[in-house]
UniProtKB/Swiss-Prot annotation:
It comes from Homo sapiens (Human). The gene is PTGS2. This is Prostaglandin G/H synthase 2. Homodimer. CDD domains: EGF_CA (cd00054), prostaglandin_endoperoxide_synthase (cd09816). Belongs to the prostaglandin G/H synthase family. It is an enzyme of class 1 (oxidoreductase). The modification S-nitrosocysteine is found at residue 526. Binds 1 heme b (iron(II)-protoporphyrin IX) group per subunit.
């Protein structure tokens, strides 16, 4: 009888044993598989490593690791020695070779086809085929682990609001030392919300952006039904209205396309565009208006070139051209600015034609979380000679009509944005959005910040002070989390020490860049079958793509061709800032923090 009791106790104890993969034992992208209840096996296939935990490098891997400089060394080289890079930029074969390496080395860090999602921490047909999920760079932490992050850290995670209050919330506006402006901030917001479209009815692991990339559904609508409501069905154009001699989006009443507006917004200010949340702030509607004008302008160009084409072909070809323009602007203007490189990035799909590369993409949940760059937002928005606080700015398209697109472009080009890394720079107006980012990451069972660093071949941080580069926030972090290997992804990205004179820390760049470049170059228009003049209506359409820039987009569609770029033109606006954030509070506590939080727009 005693023997039976002991056996029963042993079985019960075994059934409550933690999943052996909770400790994330497999290194260097090795895959952990449980064997029985208390054993695991690491699959090191094609990792370049071997051993029980995939920790021993093969001979060629050892040589590569010895020769490979650290990411910070590469960043230093690319952001210094301007004279050398000026020479390289003017030697086509050298520039092409370096750009090709940048694209392949970054893109190969992304699994394609996708591997995991929030409900499947192992390879499955469901994880591959179900487009309604965001994919995952790392599988979720197993359900039966001793702690929320696996085996490290406390048994209960710190209160998300406490994290935001102590580490993320702005005390005083910290400008971006790279000089990013509000044209950049709103471009980032407008561009990314064609593929960051969380389905909040189903949960943060699900997306409504089934195109999983640059398909411009934020211009044309996610569904065919919405697209048809927005189209004019004449000469390929989108519906529009003329106000004071300039083109603006049509109204909800004229299109019957659903948009999110509060009841108090009058009908004539309820503009209808592809993304239903873009009525939130005039900065988003500014870009929506500019791209509407660009689509209809391209239709006119194609109509002149191809009078024989009907409405459908003009529409579809114009959409492909705008996709090409978008990718070109993102790589050569937007990413170029973010990088701070003296090396000139180049959009040229032919660089990958002789490489092993898959022309498909799946948006990762971690990429969505990483892109919550709310510290970019200022305390107030300066348009011409007027300042608007958040309560005056949101859902107020009358500002757009009052000032006009030209004044918006001029003003946002001059207004500096905030620094993202370094901590304590999230505006109080979006405090609840930052808190939701932490809560949703927990719901999706993200692995720790250091596990993501290892996944992207970065050395894990060994101390809190190494992470933040200062003492005050590192002490707060340690009190909250207890273990550097238990710090969560989103808070760590925002408190990580910035690179010298940079907007981001190392991890934001080294994790974000692979997702970004794979998503851009994995677009179907970049494939050999598509990347040819005939796809875009001939040389005229191809030329529109190959000469696109943020300045040309503005000049072609905004009265007076105001100067613009993604950085402030006046160097005096860029002030030297310290790595650690100020501990004094800003004066924006009276703003209702829930004002930007609507059920379907928390990513904004």
């Amino acid at each position: 009888m005693l023997a039976r009791a002991l056996l029963l106790c042993a079985v019960l104890a075994l059934s409550h044993t933690a999943n052996p993969c909770c400790s994330h034992p497999c290194q260097n992208r090795g895959v952990c598989m449980s064997v029985g209840f208390d054993q695991y096996k690491c699959d090191c296939t094609r990792t370049g490593f071997y051993g029980e935990n995939c920790s021993t490098p093969e001979f060629l891997t050892r040589i590569k690791l010895f020769l490979k400089p650290t990411p910070n060394t590469v960043h230093y080289i690319l952001t210094h020695f301007k004279g050398f890079w000026n020479v390289v930029n003017n030697i086509p074969f050298l520039r092409n070779a370096i750009m090709s390496y940048v694209l392949t080395s970054r893109s190969h860090l992304i699994d394609s086809p996708p591997t995991y999602n929030a409900d499947y921490g192992y390879k499955s047909w469901e994880a591959f085929s179900n487009l309604s999920y965001y994919t995952r760079a790392l599988p979720p932490v197993p359900d039966d682990c001793p702690t929320p992050l696996g085996v490290k850290g406390k048994k209960q995670l710190p209160d998300s609001n406490e994290i935001v209050e102590k580490l993320l919330l702005r005390r005083k506006f910290i400008p971006d030392p790279q000089g990013s402006n509000m044209m950049f901030a709103f471009f980032a917001q407008h561009f990314t919300h064609q593929f960051f479209k969380t389905d909040h009815k189903r949960g943060p692991a699900f997306t409504n952006g089934l195109g999983h990339g640059v398909d411009l559904n934020h211009i044309y609508g996610e569904t065919l039904a919405r697209q048809r409501k927005l189209r004019l069905f004449k000469d390929g154009k989108m519906k529009y209205q003329i106000i004071d001699g300039e083109m603006y989006p049509p109204t909800v009443k004229d299109t019957q396309a659903e948009m999110i507006y509060p009841p108090q917004v009058p009908e004539h200010l309820r503009f209808a565009v592809g993304q239903e949340v873009f009525g939130l702030v005039p900065g988003l509607m500014m870009y929506a208006t500019i791209w509407l004008r660009e689509h209809n302008r391209v239709c006119d160009v194609l109509k002149q070139e191809h009078p024989e084409w009907g409405d459908e072909q003009l529409f579809q070809t114009s959409r492909l051209i705008l996709i090409g323009e978008t990718i070109k602007i993102v790589i050569e203007d937007y990413v170029q600015h973010l990088s701070g490189y003296h090396f000139k990035l180049k959009f040229d799909p032919e660089l990958l034609f002789n490489k092993q590369f898959q022309y498909q993409n799946r948006i990762a949940a971690e990429f969505n979380t990483l892109y919550h760059w709310h510290p970019l937002l200022p305390d107030t928005f300066q348009i011409h000679d007027q300042k608007y606080n958040y309560q005056q700015f949101i859902y107020n398209n009358s500002i757009l009509l009052e000032h006009g697109i030209t004044q918006f472009v001029e003003s946002f080009t001059r207004q500096i944005a905030g620094r993202v890394a370094g901590g304590r720079n999230v505006p109080p107006a979006v405090q609840k959005v930052s808190q939701a980012s932490i809560d949703q990451s927990r719901q999706m069972k993200y692995q720790s910040f250091n596990e993501y660093r290892k996944r992207f071949m970065l050395k894990p941080y060994e101390s809190f002070e190494e992470l933040t580069g200062e003492k005050e926030m590192s002490a707060e972090l340690e009190a909250l989390y207890g273990d550097i290997d238990a710090v969560e992804l989103y808070p760590a990205l925002l408190v990580e020490k910035p690179r010298p004179d940079a907007i981001f820390g190392e991890t934001m760049v080294e994790v974000g860049a692979p997702f970004s470049l794979k998503g851009l170059m994995g677009n179907v228009i970049c494939s050999p079958a598509y990347w040819k003049p005939s796809t875009f209506g001939g040389e005229v359409g191809f030329q529109i793509i190959n000469t696109a820039s943020i300045q040309s987009l503005i000049c072609n569609n905004v009265k007076g061709c105001p100067f613009t770029s993604f950085s402030v033109p006046d160097p005096e606006l860029i002030k030297t800032v310290t790595i650690n954030a100020s501990s004094s509070r800003s004066g924006l506590d009276d703003i209702n923090p829930t004002v930007l939080l609507k059920e379907r727009s928390t990513e904004l």
